[in-house]
Amino acid sequence: MCIRDRYYKPANVGGLVEWCAAVAVAAPELPFYYYDIPSMTRVSFPVDQFLREASGRIPNLAGVKFTNLDLVAYRRSLDAAGDRYDLPWGTDEALLGALATGARGGVGSTYNWAPRLYTNLIAAFERGDLETARRLQSTSIAMVDAISATGFMGTSKALMARLGVDVGPARPPLDNPSPTDVNALLQKLLSLGFDEWGAKGP
């Protein structure tokens, strides 16, 4: 998965495609995914247009991780992708809306410690139990809000360490939570049902 350079920005979709092609050609035997996350890169080109232009330029293009809350753009992109490209949804707090729009799956950071929350949400959606799916999506939103209160990246890493997967701290300039913050977070997550849907620690 490849994210666009965060300093120099392409002027148009064609420039983005050329940049991705230069990266993809370095590993032609591997599937190439472009990571579309405008909130971080400050670059927002239509993914459907990217797919059309990249289809003849990047032979190993497999899809795009779509991390953008614009469901209209997502539907357009799914239509452009057809069965040829994979477009996993990337905003955990809006998975239910994406499923209704046509998502077939997602790639999310909070899936690491809340796997059953999301598999249960997807299962509820697929059986038509929207009440349960909405409740689980609300839980996801509350969980993300709780983690974000002390800095999402650093707190996510600290939570993973508490669950037995030490991925190290966040690097500066990002902040890391104190042990007290992490203890308070775990209590908050338990109040949201973490013991039912969260990952199990050692």
Task: Report residues per predicted region.
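Short, small-residue-biased leader/transition segments that mark boundaries at the very start
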Residues: 1-3
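Active-site pre-Tyr helix/loop in NAD(P)-dependent dehydrogenases
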Residues: 6-7, 92
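Short, small-residue-enriched loops and turns at beta-alpha junctions
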Residues: 7-13, 38-44, 72, 174-176
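Alpha-helix N-cap and loop-to-helix initiation/capping positions
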Residues: 11-19, 49
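Short linear sequence elements within intrinsically disordered, low-complexity coil regions
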Residues: 12-13, 79, 199
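Catalytic alpha/beta core domains of metabolic enzymes, predominantly
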Residues: 24-30, 38-148
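C-terminal alpha-helical cap/extension of soluble enzyme domains
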Residues: 103, 110, 114-202
